[in-house]
Amino acid sequence: IQGCQSRTVRDTAAFVDACRGPAPGEFMPFWSPPEPYTRLIARDPTRLKIAMSHRWGDYQSTPHIAAELDKAGRFLESLGHHVDYALPELDYREAFAAQTTCYISNFAIVISNMLAARGLTEPPEDLIEPINIRIWEHGRHTSYAERARMQAVFNTTSRGFGAFFEDWDIILTPITALPTPNHSTMATLLSP
């Protein structure tokens, strides 16, 4: 669930119940379950079709992480669910590129708005981290045409996921494909 990392199904259900649904005046329709998730999790689910993958586009989990995913899949099978390897048919490279454009351009707008509120045109190096200044520099001149292409890819990608979830109830993937870098290696992430 985007925005929530929890240790229990109960906590995740409570998070979704608290956050689901539209804000007042929302122009998009929202699906809601017939009852709160905190009540739905109190009973056993029907047999689920669970897709599983340790690959996501060009990225593949390390053997250790893939083995842990397999272990989770076997556990779910032991509970009576159908588990198999499957992925949505998507152009993952295009989707990653669109998400990167979205993140960088949205981030640049947020930083630019903060700067404008303070009468600044450039991020002060003593207040903004170097990586964030670089993201701002890269995203601040994103064109409308780039944003329109990004939205078109989002539309195609979401339709691919929609078609996938006509056949599958859940897709189970690792949160991250690689182990967390050691603290001493963080400097290399900021190197030019």
Where are these predicted regions, by residue range?
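Flexible, glycine/charged-enriched surface loops at secondary-structure junctions
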Residues: P24-F30, E77-L90
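Active-site pocket-shaping loop/turn-to-helix segments
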Residues: Y59-L69, T101, A145-Q151
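Short glycine-/acidic-enriched loop or helix-start segments at secondary-structure transitions
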Residues: S61-T62, A95, P181-S184, L189
